[in-house]
Curated annotation (Swiss-Prot):
Binds specifically to phosphatidylinositol 3-phosphate (PtdIns3P), but not to other phosphoinositides. It comes from Mus musculus (Mouse). Disulfide bonds: none annotated. Residues 211-222 have a biased composition (Polar residues). This is Pleckstrin homology domain-containing family A member 4. InterPro entries: PH-like_dom_sf, PH_domain, PKHA4-7_PH. Residues 183-193 have a biased composition (Basic and acidic residues). The lineage of its organism: Eukaryota, Metazoa, Chordata, Craniata, Vertebrata. Coiled coil: none annotated.
Length: 588
């Protein structure tokens, strides 16, 4: 009696999401029971993969066994349509198993889950088997969670509505010959809804381009029609993007059965109900080009059997028309039910530059910073100039001491012991002179570098003063008061510095290598020792001296006994006393 009943389109559509992928195998072997439909299919019992469906994501995952030692096995997983297949390797030759994802809950495991691996997630269904998978990296985990979550949520929402376009062909599906009796018993409970649902099915079937074989084909065909217009498409049929984890969303409420008076056809017939077109993310452009070509549209058997007019192909429309039609059919409340988009894909949420900073505060900070740098460079220039003066005085003292040593060597050629000490003293003075000249070279280069920086700061300060003077004459009253205050600040700073610095003379001392600054104290000690050895009070100096030698050593004109040698007196000290002494020094 059950076999003679007319098959209801609602009963066929309710089971099409689970068994329609086995339509090609229904003539060879009986279909499994309804309560086994969502079970994990292995090897020969796995679902047949449709090569025309696009692949949303594929890659390596680790699957945990459901029994035994619960070992982890590495498998190649492919998400095609709304079905998850896995293979032994990436060649995808033979399917090891398949999982149909409608109504599955995909969630990541917490940090305290005793899984033994990182980046694990779980796919579970109430009253059915739970699958535990693990990714290699965090990016892979995000991509898989987003893809599987979208697939399961998209199918779960469509399950609450009548799937009249997904009507099985005659002789196929669970309602045909050899189908399970439980499906037929469910048809008896829904037979009262058949007229309304059939009328709705005929109305929606007029606008469909073709009738897919299964709910997976229906979802993919709808998605392929959306991809023809790159401006707008559905967020539920969008391919996954591994940018962020899927956001949780509450389960859709089951709607009451539609009546004949409530049936209204939307402005866009081929758009599924409760689905809103939104703008695609920026990162999905290159990924969409890699998808396979959608199947060629064909006329479904429903339109041929009913004798209705041929389907119309969707006409291209502008984004404004799409938005207006969507708002007219769905209402403003539908937009409130949409989940928030991930942060990485919010094309409309662009950070705009904030309001400009207060000009007075910015100008005050700029003036203060410029004056601070100028004072620092001025202090550094003065310190370098002092160091240069000290080194120059020390160099002149060493040159004067060397000149006296040469005179003493020319007079003490007869005594070998005294001559050896004089030669050692002369060598020490020469080394100190080389180090002082090297330090002079280093200080001169540093002064030139600091002077270049100081000149640049002076130019910036001049430009700033011109700007302040311009604001003082032509600015607003508030700007005038601020400019006057900054001008006073600049004038006070320049007055404290003593006016602009003068450019130092260019010095190019010849030096073999720069000397470190730490040797200054040792050089001064060596110089004092050498000067004490060359003084007349030293008991070691016993060679003969020319007449007036004591006066030459003690007189302030010689520059050796005085603590400070002037630059004017140094040329006189460097000249030998007579041409005969100069000849003897050259001979030595």
């Amino acid at each position: 009696m059950e076999q003679g009943r007319p098959r209801s389109s609602l009963s066929l559509a309710s089971s099409a999401s689970t068994v329609s992928s086995l339509s090609s195998l229904s003539t060879k072997k009986p279909t499994r029971a309804v309560h086994k439909v969502h079970a994990f299919g292995k090897r020969n019992n796995a679902l047949r993969r449709d090569p025309n469906l696009p692949v949303h994501i594929r890659g390596w995952l680790h699957k945990q066994d459901s029994s035994g030692l619960r070992l982890w096995k590495r498998r190649w997983f492919v998400l095609s349509g709304h079905c998850l297949f896995y293979y032994k390797d990436s060649r995808e030759e033979s399917v090891l198993g398949s999982v149909l994802l409608p109504s599955y809950s995909v969630r990541p495991d917490g940090p305290g889950a005793p899984r033994g691996r990182r980046f694990t997630f779980t796919a579970e269904h109430p009253g059915m088997r739970t699958y535990v998978l693990a990714a290699d990296t965090l990016e892979d985990l995000r991509g898989w969670l987003r893809a599987l979550g979208r697939a399961s949520r998209a199918e779960g929402e469509d399950c609450g509505l009548p799937r009249s376009p997904a009507r099985p062909r005659p002789g196929e599906g669970p309602g045909g010959p050899g189908g399970p009796p439980e499906v037929n018993r469910r048809e008896e409970g829904r037979i009262s809804e058949s007229p309304e649902v059939a009328r709705l099915s005929r109305g929606l079937g007029r606008h469909e381009t073709h009738t897919p074989n299964s709910t997976v084909d229906l979802q993919t065909d709808t998605w392929s029609r959306r991809t023809r217009s790159p401006e707008l498409f559905s967020p539920l049929s969008r391919p996954p993007s591994p940018l962020s984890l899927p956001r949780p969303r509450s389960a859709p409420a089951r709607r009451p059965p539609l009546s004949a008076g409530d049936i209204s056809f939307p402005a866009r017939p081929h758009t599924p109900l409760s689905r809103i077109d939104v703008r695609p993310p920026l990162d999905w452009g290159p990924q969409r080009q890699t998808l396979s070509r959608p199947p060629i549209p064909r006329r479904g058997p429903s339109s041929e059997a009913g004798g209705e007019r041929p389907p119309r192909s969707p006409q291209p429309r502008t984004p404004e028309q799409r938005t207006q039609s969507t708002q007219a059919t769905s209402g403003s409340s539908t937009y409130l039910q949409l989940p928030p988009r991930p942060p990485g894909t919010q094309a409309s949420m662009i950070l705009l530059p904030g309001p400009p900073v207060d000009s007075a505060l910015h100008q005050s900070l700029e003036t203060d910073t410029l004056l601070t740098k100028l004072c620092g460079q001025d202090r550094l220039l003065r310190q370098l100039q002092e160091d240069l003066d000290k080194r120059q005085e020390e160099k002149e003292q060493l040159e004067a001491a060397l000149e006296l040593t040469r005179q003493q060597l020319g007079q003490a050629t007869r005594e070998a012991a005294a001559s050896g000490k004089a030669w050692g003293r002369q060598r020490l003075l020469q080394d100190r002179l080389v180090n002082v000249r090297a330090a002079l070279c280093h200080l001169a280069q540093e002064r030139e570098r600091v002077w270049d920086t100081y000149s640049g700061l002076e130019q910036d300060l001049g430009t700033l003063r011109e700007t302040l003077e311009y604001l003082l004459h032509l600015g607003s009253p508030q700007d005038r008061a601020c400019a006057q205050q900054h001008l006073w600040m600049v004038e006070d700073t320049l007055a404290g510095l003593g006016g602009p610095q003068k450019q130092p003379p260019h010095t190019d001392p010849k030096s073999p290598s720069p000397a470190p600054q730490g040797e200054e104290s040792s050089e001064r000690e060596s110089l004092s020792e050498s000067l004490e050895l060359s003084s007349p009070q030293s008991p070691e100096v016993d060679w003969s001296r020319p007449s007036g030698g004591d006066r030459a050593l003690s007189s302030p004109q010689s520059g050796v006994g005085s603590p400070r040698v002037s630059r004017a007196s140094s040329p006189e000290c460097r000249q030998p006393s007579s041409p005969l002494l100069r000849t003897k020094v050259d001979h030595l």
